[in-house]
Amino acid sequence: MIAPACRPFVRAALLPVAFASVLAAPALAAPDMNKVVREVFPAAETGFDPAAVHDLYSGTLIQGIFETLYTYDYLARPSKVVPLAADGMPQITDNGRTWTVKLKKGIRFADDPVFGGKPRELTADDYVYSIKRLIDPRIRSPWAFLVEGKLVGLDEVAEQAKKSGRFDYDRKVPGIEAVDRHTIRFRLKETDYNLPYILAHEPTSAVAREVIEKYGESDGRALANPVGTGPYRLAKWVRSSKISLEANPHYRGFTWNFASADPADAALVREMKGKAMPQVGRVEISIIEEDQARLLAFQGDEIDLMNMEGPLAPKVLDGGTLKPELQAKGVKLSRIVDPDLSYTYWNMTDPVVGGLAKEKVALRRAMAMSYNVADEIRVIRNGQAIEARYPIPPGVVGHDPAWKSGIAYDPAGANALLDRFGYKRGADGWRTLPDGKPLVVRLSSRPDTLGRQQDELWKKSLDAIGVRMDVHKDKFPELIKAEKQCKLQMRVASWIADYPDGDNFMQLLYGPNTNQSNNACARIPEFDRLYARTQKMPPGPERDKLYQEMTRVIEAYAPWRLMISRYRNMLVQPHVLGYKRHPILHAHWQYLDVAPRGPNK
């Protein structure tokens, strides 16, 4: 079980010093531009603005281009927070309400014309500016919840911006200030046990104000022209098709010096230990939506790293191991249960499926009861998932492995529930609303194999209870945009842990997070009240008890149908060295090397 690196952070002070130096050593050599890692994404990116994007694939790119104050040790399990741009772990005073962070000196942004040909050093002001952007009303950041209500004086600046139409970035905020060029001080309203995770999460990455002001759109977002301090910079971008990254020549680098307690990592450590990083000079990412096309590209040695989705499992795996023919070629498999959750949500503001009225609750519960998760795991995922019965997945602090869900597959019970609340069947077999109007629900999904399979299973499920379903297809970025505006009625969504704590999942239904991470646009007073109480608690039995109460509220009102947590099966070509799937980090290129390949490669 992945326990948080900083669960006792405030009370037990700092993490072991050994971890503080893992990423601090200077590089000994420049990356080799002839070393290329080719990867594939199954869905398109939405952009490169840390404050604006909200999808896994864009977030992965941001991790490679920008830098947060903290990150995670590459091999440590459970996940451990370590410094990245910070020069050591924070100094914590005032009973955990004041955090002081020192920056490493001499970190440079990648070159850009906006800097006028001069070197641009990373400073404390950059982090102050970047974190303020999360709460700027004009940007409408989906990550505002990370800082709302937490930093002294910051909410007041946001409220003033709502009235004036302009966020005053120059106004001093006691909760986040640059003490000097390389020192940041955070003052919290209450002790926040998740602050270390937030400062390791890519929305808090440093951007340069002059870059945002030069390239930003009218809404304050700068989805193109990323300029960061990370190991890579954007070299070429063909939207929704190809992304090319190249090594940032000003990146300071580090020495690969990670340790692992897992004997299975011994060979990996031997082949990588002591190398100047990054070794990889270029990263080429292709967007290939169809499962079979991705597999063919991997088999044809056109890509080096690929996450194998469930539909491909029979072609690649025997149980949980690679088929012998792939093993014979030297292909490697890195496999974990992702700290993620797939669920179907219903828009709680929608006039057909939303609301807290008893008949609306009955409709959602009946639809949830009609869906057989076992069929999804068997048919769609080919066994590459486990059923999710609790809203916090395995490997995340707060997960309850013994939980007995109150929502089970029960089509007979679902039909009885609809009958009881006035959803009558017409002569054609389809149900109507209690007022006699037609009942039609609309599922939104991606136009790929997985999306079509999910459409079919949901239609089969709803057909069995007499609920007519239409399907709306759109590209992934457009679906994300629409759901943030509460415009979708029903969709299958996934959330992978930003940090390994249950709060990261329970916040998905917190009312004030609507238009950010609350895709169901739910405002359930009982849930919100309980969630607010958890914000003042450290991880432990008392908070876990509240999470259990919150889970019963979710089951009672059914804004979601919990579905699965997925296995992540990363296929790795034999010439790629150093890869191990991390439960939280998604950008891994700076930790890899590429061995010489045969003459036909």
Which positions does each model-derived feature cover?
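Bacterial N-terminal signal peptides that target proteins for export
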Residues: 2-15
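Bacterial N-terminal signal peptides
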Residues: 12-24
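Sec/Tat signal peptide C-region and signal peptidase I cleavage site
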Residues: 25-29
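Extracytoplasmic/periplasmic ligand-capture domains
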Residues: 30, 74-75, 90, 98-100, ...
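Surface-exposed intrinsically disordered loops and tails
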Residues: 36, 115, 153-170
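N-terminal lobe/hinge region of extracytoplasmic solute-binding protein
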Residues: 40-94, 227
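A structural "hinge/loop" feature
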Residues: 43-61, 82-85, 113-116, 142-143, ...
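Glycine-rich and polybasic anion-binding loops at the starts of cofactor/ligand-binding domains
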Residues: 563
